[in-house]
Amino acid sequence: MFPKINTIDPYISLRLFEVKPKYVGYSSVDARNQSFAIHDIKDYEKFSNAGLFYTSPTEITCYCCGMKFCNWLYEKHPLQVHGFWSRNCGFMRATLGIIGLKKMIDSYNDYYNNEVFVKHKNRVYTHKKLEDMGFSKPFMQFILANAFIPPYRKYIHKIILNDRYFTFKFAAHLLSFHKVNLDNQTTYCMTCGIEPIKKDENFCNACKTLNYKHYKTLNFSVKL
């Protein structure tokens, strides 16, 4: 879960001020709960208790400071993340107090830095592996944009270990459910990501021949 715009303030202001929520309609926890409940989202209470309400499938917003967060659905610690990025939010100050907010930020800081570092390192390493395997740049960008979202994470771990079988399995599994026009005009081969193919096909002629036996071993149906 990350803010759409990085406005992090390294200091916690000690000044007193009257809190004026930017979205008054979501000041109550019931209103925030309802914003999630109507979209059939599970375990939404942790988000509404953190002062956040549902905006879209890719975005939630703090009713008080107005900060918008993306990549939120699988976040386990929304209160800590909210406080980490919006340290002078009136809701966070009222909920935890200045001392409590500072302690929470200090305890979360190590976890956050380690988590971000590991993900960044894996993305860089994975990008290099995909490049070495001959995947096209737009294809790699598409893979990395979805790679760390469950249930695809297990395939990325195999890519990091340079297992070409699982790289192909991941790419084909992902694209078989999401028919993608990578440049909005051309559809590329699901296997190599390089050769353009017709709209009603999934693989180029070379990959159809080379990978026929390979795709027969997979656990899902792929049109050859």
UniProtKB/Swiss-Prot annotation:
**UniProt key word Metal-binding:** yes
**Binding positions (Zn(2+)):** C62, C65, H82, C89
Tell me the SMART domains matching this sequence: BIR
The answer on whether this UniProt entry bears the keyword Flavoprotein reads no
- Pfam families in alphabetical order: ASFV_p27, BIR
Which UniProt keywords are listed?
Metal-binding, Zinc
Determine the domain of life of the protein's source.
Viruses
Swiss-Prot/TrEMBL BIR repeat ranges: 29-92
GO molecular function terms listed in the Swiss-Prot or TrEMBL record: metal ion binding
**CDD domains, alphabetically?**
BIR
Query: PROSITE patterns annotated for this entry?
Result: BIR_REPEAT_1, BIR_REPEAT_2
Q: What does this protein do?
A: Not essential for growth or virulence. Does not have antiapoptotic function.
Please state what the protein is called.
IAP-like protein p27
Source organism per entry reads African swine fever virus (isolate Tick/South Africa/Crocodile Cr3/1996)
